[in-house]
Amino acid sequence: VKGQQTLKAAEVLVYDRLGSEELLSLVPEDCERIYVGKEAGHHIKKQSEINRILVEKALEGKRVVRLKGGDPFVFGRGGEEIQALTEAGIPYEVIPGVTSAIGALEAAGIPVTHRNIARDFHVFTGHISHEGGEGLSGDYSLYAKLPGTLIFLMGLSNLEEIVKRLIDGGKDGETPAAVVTDGTPVSYTHLTLPTT
């Protein structure tokens, strides 16, 4: 409800590719909409430019809403955005949604944990390493030995390599697995600023 009210009061909306038409329809007609959509290998705006837009629009005294798909604080660069706001002295409020790491599985009817089967869960990026520029990051021989549910976000394009590395690391090839894409297209987190 709070997220809905926030969208209805927006003067500037900065939103991603994963924004749903249902949510976008809540924004007032006269709201300035700034599309900053990102997808693998193609960024409309660089992260530094998104940060600059958020700061500039807030400093203009406008009620800015940042609509992000999934969980902005789990591989979503939301931390970088609030860091830019904090450094600029701009107050903000985070209105959390359901993290896609859990919500997508729930929407598919897959328990993240289940008594006597999976008492733990672990979340990893399935994306290419930004540090090295190529290849997956992380110690897959370690991941393969972890108990419980292993969740890889943004890993569809690297699925074959993820599976190979887990099996090479010792994971049983018969381990049950599921692939969920676009599992919760309306699970969003909103950053709202300023909060004066």
Predicted features, each with a name:
Residues 189-195:
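Conserved small/polar residues in nucleotide/adenosyl-binding loops
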Residues 137-176:
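Conserved anion/nucleotide-ligand pocket segment
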Residues 69-146, 186:
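Class I SAM-dependent methyltransferase SAM-binding "motif I" and its flanking Rossmann-like core
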Residues 20-24, 131, 161, 186-188:
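Short, charged/polar "capping" segments at the starts of alpha-helices
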Residues 31-38, 91-93, 112-122, 170-179:
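Short hydrophobic/aromatic-enriched beta-strand-loop microsegments
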Residues 178-188:
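Short, flexible loop segments at boundaries between secondary-structure elements
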Residues 3-98:
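Class I S-adenosyl-L-methionine
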Residues 2-6, 28-31, 80-84, 110, ...:
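Short, solvent-exposed amphipathic alpha-helical segments in soluble enzyme
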